[in-house]
Amino acid sequence: MRIAITGTPGVGKTTISKVLRDRLGIKVIDITEAVKKYKLYTEKDEDMDSYVIDFEKLEKFIDEIEEKEKTIILDGHVSHLLNPDYIIVLRCNPEIIKERLEKRGYKPKKVLENIQAEILDVCLCESKGKVYEIDTTNRDVENIVDEIIEAIKHKKERKGVVDWTEKYFDYLTLEIK
């Protein structure tokens, strides 16, 4: 079983995935790290300081791990595009995402692009199949993990519970060159 933990950078995917791994003993694949470490990309986008993923190579890499593991967690903002059986979409207040990404040293253009992606529900809209959406804003990690475990256990589905468009509409009209 493939469980995708997806969402805009800065929502808490890696933190949540690590706690799930520790509590459930499930193998976690950090998509970003795997892409870099095993060169599962076609090129590096210098302007956005990111990699253009070779999805065919990445899928093959995941298939090999999945043959050995009963269940795996795919941690990454593109994990929902990797044929998961179940998708957890983490959401977070755009202002908090902005702070986190700036602390990580993201370029202003990349920060804005990710804030806009969160406001526009990009990861949620791209997620197909069994999807469960969670707002992580100001929530305890253990509480979030408890909710995820319950959702997976009972195959719960929930979409459209978070909407940042009205409150943060102004971010959508900004442009950084």
From Swiss-Prot:
Coiled coil spans: none
Annotated ATP binding sites: G10, G12, K13, T14, T15, R104
UniProt keyword Cytoplasm present: no
Annotated stretches, region: LID: 103-113
Class of the enzyme per the UniProt entry, highest EC level: transferase
Record-level Gene Ontology MF annotations: adenylate kinase activity; ATP binding; ATP hydrolysis activity
Region of interest: NMP: 30-53
Keyword Metal-binding (UniProt): no
Any one biological process term the GO annotation gives: rRNA processing
Keywords: ATP-binding, Kinase, Nucleotide-binding, Ribosome biogenesis, rRNA processing, Transferase
Reactions accelerated catalytically: AMP + ATP = 2 ADP; ATP + H2O = ADP + phosphate + H(+)
SUPFAM superfamilies in alphabetical order: P-loop containing nucleoside triphosphate hydrolases (SSF52540)
Enzyme Commission (EC) number: 2.7.4.3
General function of this protein: Broad-specificity nucleoside monophosphate (NMP) kinase that catalyzes the reversible transfer of the terminal phosphate group between nucleoside triphosphates and monophosphates. Also has ATPase activity. Involved in the late maturation steps of the 30S ribosomal particles, specifically 16S rRNA maturation. While NMP activity is not required for ribosome maturation, ATPase activity is. Associates transiently with small ribosomal subunit protein uS11. ATP hydrolysis breaks the interaction with uS11.
Assembly and interaction partners: Interacts with uS11. Not a structural component of 40S pre-ribosomes, but transiently interacts with them by binding to uS11.
Family: Belongs to the adenylate kinase family. AK6 subfamily.
HAMAP family noted in UniProt: Adenylate_kinase_AK6
The name this protein goes by in its record: Putative adenylate kinase
Organism: Methanocaldococcus jannaschii (strain ATCC 43067 / DSM 2661 / JAL-1 / JCM 10045 / NBRC 100440) (Methanococcus jannaschii)
